């Protein structure tokens, strides 16, 4: 009976997907690093309208589950363990952990189902809008090796975006890199909305992640989007650049209230997801 109900729900979701082309598309943007396993994730507009989930929001799908249909991140939060990151300094950054098999759900509660077989999610809500970043792997900080097939991502709703004003607009940043085995990264970003450029950095211990190579800036377009090849650096003590990576992301909200992105080093063990709120 439960399987029949689940199959019926999936059928409804597939119908929603097939009808999506006839409806106005939500303004959801995002990106993820490449996957390497049998299962991979893709971020984008959510398509599931039942249970705890809502269609048309920032979401994620797993290729090996229900044909990769995307569910919204907000709908995953009731089933997740929540931790506020350095409260009082980053305007409400909260990391949610949804882990298989740790997150068992509540039997009989359609708004808190079990998530067995869906892998391990660490994801962060940025500010008050529908903006998220995080990491996914098949096993998280368990097993050997840990964090298998790891991917990082960001996704959010661009509706209502307007540029900020000023040549030195500051943001407080948070980043994730194998959260659970490590703590979160912290940092800052300064954006010039006249020249549409920014630079920033994140750090954890003695490791620094530069957003913009030493002495250079990353450009963003009139819609607050950026995609800069080899513009990120993984820097270790001695100012040695261990690796460079692509920096992708977006500013979101009125007056560019938030920002989120990834640094894709082409190495699942090094890739970073990050985001922040305007100071």
Q: Residues of each region from the PLM?
A:
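Mature soluble binding/inhibitory domains
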Residues: 25-279
């Amino acid at each position: 009976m439960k399987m029949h109900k689940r199959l019926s729900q999936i059928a409804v979701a597939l119908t929603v997907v097939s009808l999506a082309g006839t409806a106005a598309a939500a303004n959801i943007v995002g990106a993820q690093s490449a996957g390497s396993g049998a299962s991979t994730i893709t971020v984008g507009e959510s398509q599931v309208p039942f249970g705890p989930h809502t269609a048309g929001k920032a979401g994620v799908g797993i290729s090996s589950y229900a044909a990769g249909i995307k569910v919204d991140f907000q709908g995953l939060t009731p089933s997740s363990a929540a931790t506020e990151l350095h409260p009082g300094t980053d305007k409400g950054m909260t990391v949610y952990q949804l882990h298989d098999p740790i997150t068992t759900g509540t039997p009989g509660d359609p708004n808190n189902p079990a998530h067995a077989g869906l892998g391990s999610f660490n994801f962060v809500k940025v500010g008050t809008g529908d903006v998220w970043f995080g990491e996914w792997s098949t096993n998280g900080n368990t097993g050997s090796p840990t964090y298998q097939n790891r991917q990082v991502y960001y996704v959010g709703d661009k509706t209502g975006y307007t540029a900020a004003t000023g040549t030195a607009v500051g943001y407080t940043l948070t980043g994730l890199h194998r959260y659970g085995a490590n703590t979160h990264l912290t940092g800052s970003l300064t954006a010039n909305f006249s020249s549409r450029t920014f630079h920033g950095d994140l750090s954890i211990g003695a490791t620094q992640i530069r957003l913009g190579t030493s002495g250079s800036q990353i450009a963003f377009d009139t819609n607050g989007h950026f995609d800069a090849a080899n513009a990120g650096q993984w820097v270790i003590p001695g100012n040695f650049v261990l690796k460079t990576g692509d920096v992708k992301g977006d500013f979101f909200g009125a007056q560019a209230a938030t920002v989120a992105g990834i640094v894709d080093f082409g190495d699942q063990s090094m890739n970073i997801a990050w985001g922040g709120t305007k100071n």
